[in-house]
Amino acid sequence: VPFPSNILEAISKMSFSHAMDRVASTRSSAGTLARPTLNLHLDRGRVSITKNSGSNIQNRSDSNGSQHPEPKPFILILLLAVLLGLLAFPVGLQAQELADLKRFIGKNDSILVTDANGQAVLEKNADKKRMPASILKIFTSLVALHYLGDDYRFPTEFYLDDQSNLKIKGYGDPLLISEVISKISQVLAVLLKSSQPLNDLVLDDSYFQQPLTIPGITSSTQPYDAPNGSLCVNFNTVSFKLTSQGYVSAEPQTPLLPFVIKKIKASGLKQGRIVFSHSQNEIVLYAGKLFQYFFEKQGMHFKGKVKLGRINDNNDRLIFRYDSSSSLAQIVVKLLEHSNNFTTNQLLIATGAKIIGPPGTLAKGVTIASDYAKEILNNEDITIVEGSGISRDNRISAVQMNQVLQEFLPYHHLMRRQGREFYKTGTLYGVSTRAGYIKRSNGEFYRYVIMFNTPGKSTNALILRLLRILD
């Protein structure tokens, strides 16, 4: 039973054997007194009580020879009642403090907190489906980890055809960034040293269906609206600023290509970030232009142009396969930390393509996620229309999200950590959510889900109260 440390110290100094000797003795048939005792065991802030039948001792008498009277049974009962009442007090206090938190949960909100055994210690509206916002990323990450494996690495393949065209085929790697492309170009410059000059740089983005439309994604310049594709670089965004010398890249590792400057000028922005779209194949063409820049920086030459095309499996020769330097588990760490919508849906679509077959589509990814919910979570009622939580059409209950957390427990270390808490937050207009784990002193975990679908509410104050109450 949980017990306050100051009272534990006082209890540990008490002699219950002596008290029970005077209060709870009973006469034995041999004319001796059998002395039952209550033993207290203190361990990690908890008290347990055991009763020993005791050994026989000689009946004691006063100096005048009179014997002690036998104790009244009600005295023993009274003492036990007082003890049990004291021991139950902290448990009742914690339960009351948790129950008081229900006042923060409105009709459009939900909360569920369970212990390591799955028993609810706090719940309200837990079976009502809510908009999860970005805590849905936990579910999508779990689906990808289940089907692809935590050490899965996204490939990108490079081919050479008989016309000296260099071809690149993408498979959805969300972390093809400038630093990676620079390293790839160093390898290819060595491998293709005898094949210079090259003709065209051909880009194959057929592993994902194009264009991909994600519910909730708009055509804004915000990074969270970056579209998806199988051959994308730098999250389909470029950061820039305007100086006295003109527009420059805000990231020294990434050049500001003429292809990009034209789009920046059209935006009218002086600084910030632009997002490429599916319009006029911007996404894949930007990837090709960036690869070309780093190839030429390593001394490679192209006589032709950057264009879209396809790999010919019969005639084209695979010369290099780059497997992502980041495992899927490492990608999940980054997407949960930065709440990256682009990366999350890349995982969902790539998982669908891997399991069902290319081309990858959002529908295939959603199908795989739904299959996981049915087969692993034994739940057919999760509504998912995309993987990141940006769509307001996603729906999941606190009970269902708690099931996700139960399965995600082996991966809890991939989440952001703050003290005893491992967590993911979510935010949309009028939506504030938080889900994760609270680690106990004994190493076990509470699982919690908080979903506010009421405008103006935040989960911050509530989680602080939970952390204070829960051991």
Model-derived features: positions:
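C-terminal soluble interaction/assembly domains
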Residues: 383-471
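Short hydrophobic targeting helices and cationic amphipathic motifs
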Residues: 8, 17, 22, 40-42, ...
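Short, low-complexity intrinsically disordered segments enriched in A/P/G/S/L with frequent Arg
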Residues: 24-27, 33-36, 41-47, 60, ...
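Conserved serine DD-peptidase/penicillin-binding transpeptidase domain
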Residues: 97-99, 146-379
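Active/ligand-binding-proximal structured segments within catalytic/core domains
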Residues: 131-144
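Low-acidity, Ser/Thr- and Arg-rich intrinsically disordered low-complexity segments
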Residues: 3-17, 22-29, 35, 48
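Beta-lactamase-like hydrolase cores
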Residues: 93-131, 148-154, 187-195, 467-469
